[in-house]
């Protein structure tokens, strides 16, 4: 009794982002009940823009287009565009038809851009002023229009034809005399992006220059929108998550709880198949050296650690390089420098761990002469080779315009399995005269 009223009071004190986080951990039936309470507040639009797409599709099944139009009328146009992109096409079109013409045209303008470009991320709600205005007049306009713009930290100065001319921060505006014209106090060296700039590059620009928003211009350099830092934070998090998931062969969707078991299995299968192929080929190599293995059975005991050390250092190297490529800290002009540096790292670590394992083999299997030497050299060679392969593969894939995050993992693990086992037995055959 009174539970709904208490829940309503609690929701009114809760940020929509926190509501969305809790919402995703509820059952389907619980979500329906809680949303019915959320629907009694004016936070529905903010809440819908925060929740996961899979949950959004669950919720809208029970909502009418007329109700959704009322909700999105209070939302920012870029959030509306994102919402409509997530909905089934038929439902999205029905909602668009019911929208006010001016709002519909604004949203349609945003939806024409790819969602992973500056055009797809931008908000058309920005503060643009004519350069002929005085600082005093500009302050009055900002006060009158502050609720209309996405962010008032920056004021963008345009020519009469709408072309971007400069930028000035709100702080700088307040510090200048009210009679000074904007064109005389603005910063004309504006960092901007175009509507088709990839979201990765937009994120790089904002983080590189430590700005809160970046203006978006069209092919004629007309100011059409801004991308704000809050949107870019989401992009950076999503891109980093996607890269790490793809490196592990787990697809690019981190919402494993919202996907079916079969979907998760199918997503991971190709990467695991590549590892399986590498394991099978390594098995055939071991079988090929069956006679040598029978003569020195102790060789079998060290196969896992030799291959494991190679696989681990290859993963480290490839992860460092892939992340470096993504952040722009590693480029193709330094290809040989990067490869030789990681090769030296592999050589140092291979020497250290090869020495340790060689001593272990020497004292643990004293009856087999030179086994310690075989194991030590194998670890040294395999770790050096693995560090080189782990560095070389993502750089070459990048040069060939392949997605290094996706292709590196399977290729590297398969290569190390095959080359590591082969090198181990060839070294053993040579040093032990098998």
Question: Where does each model-flagged region fall?
Answer:
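Short helical (or helix-break) motifs at transmembrane helix termini and adjacent helical loops
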Residues: 243, 307-323, 413-421
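Membrane-water interface of transmembrane alpha-helices in multipass transporters/channels
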Residues: 288-303, 365-377
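Non-transmembrane, extramembrane segments of multi-pass ion/lipid transporters
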Residues: 105, 231-264, 317-339, 395-401
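Interfacial loop-to-transmembrane junctions
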Residues: 396-416
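Alpha-helical transmembrane segments in multi-pass membrane proteins
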Residues: 16, 271-279, 283, 302, ...
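Juxtamembrane "helix exit" motif at the C-terminal ends of alpha-helical transmembrane segments
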Residues: 36, 276-293, 356-367
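Hydrophobic packing positions in regular secondary-structure scaffolds
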Residues: 1-251
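Soluble-to-membrane junctions at the N-terminal ends of transmembrane alpha-helices
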Residues: 255-274, 332-351, 375-376
């Amino acid at each position: 009794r009174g539970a709904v009223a208490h829940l309503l009071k609690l929701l009114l004190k809760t940020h929509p982002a926190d509501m969305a986080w809790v919402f995703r951990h509820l059952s389907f039936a619980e979500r329906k009940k809680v949303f019915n309470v959320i629907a009694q507040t004016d936070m529905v639009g903010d809440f819908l823009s925060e929740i996961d797409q899979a949950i959004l599709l669950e919720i809208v099944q029970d909502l009418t287009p007329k109700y959704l139009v009322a909700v999105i009328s209070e939302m920012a146009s870029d959030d509306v565009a994102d919402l409509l992109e997530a909905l089934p096409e038929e439902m999205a079109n029905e909602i668009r038809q019911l929208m006010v013409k001016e709002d519909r045209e604004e949203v349609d303008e945003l939806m024409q851009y790819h969602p992973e470009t500056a055009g797809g991320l931008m908000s058309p709600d920005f503060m643009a002023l004519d350069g002929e205005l005085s600082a005093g007049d500009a302050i009055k306009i900002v006060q009158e229009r502050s609720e209309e713009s996405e962010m008032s930290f920056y004021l963008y100065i345009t020519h009469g034809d709408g072309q971007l001319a400069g930028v000035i921060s709100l702080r700088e505006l307040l510090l200048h005399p009210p009679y000074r014209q904007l064109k005389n106090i603005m910063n004309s060296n504006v960092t901007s992006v175009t509507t088709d700039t990839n979201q990765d590059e937009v994120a790089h620009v904002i983080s590189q220059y430590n700005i809160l928003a970046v203006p978006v211009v069209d092919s004629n350099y007309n100011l059409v929108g801004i991308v704000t830092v809050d949107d870019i934070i989401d992009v950076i998090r999503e891109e980093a998550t996607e890269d790490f998931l793809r490196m592990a062969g787990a697809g690019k969707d981190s919402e494993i709880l919202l996907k079916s078991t079969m979907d998760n299995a199918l997503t991971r299968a190709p990467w695991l198949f590549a590892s399986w192929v590498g394991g099978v080929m390594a098995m055939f190599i071991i079988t090929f050296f069956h006679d040598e293995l029978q003569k020195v059975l102790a060789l079998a005991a060290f196969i896992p650690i030799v291959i494991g050390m190679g696989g681990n250092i290859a993963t480290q190297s490839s992860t460092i390089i892939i992340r470096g490529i993504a952040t722009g800290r590693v480029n193709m002009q330094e290809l040989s420098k990067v490869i030789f540096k990681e090769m030296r790292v592999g050589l140092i670590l291979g020497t250290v761990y090869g020495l340790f394992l060689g001593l272990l083999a020497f004292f643990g299997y004293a009856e087999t002469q030179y086994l310690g030497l075989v194991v030590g050299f194998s670890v040294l060679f395999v770790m050096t080779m693995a560090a080189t392969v782990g560095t070389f593969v993502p750089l070459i894939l990048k040069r060939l315009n392949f997605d290094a995050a996706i292709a590196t993992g399977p290729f590297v693990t398969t290569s190390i399995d095959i080359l590591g086992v082969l090198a181990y037995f060839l070294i053993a055959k040579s040093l032990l005269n098998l």
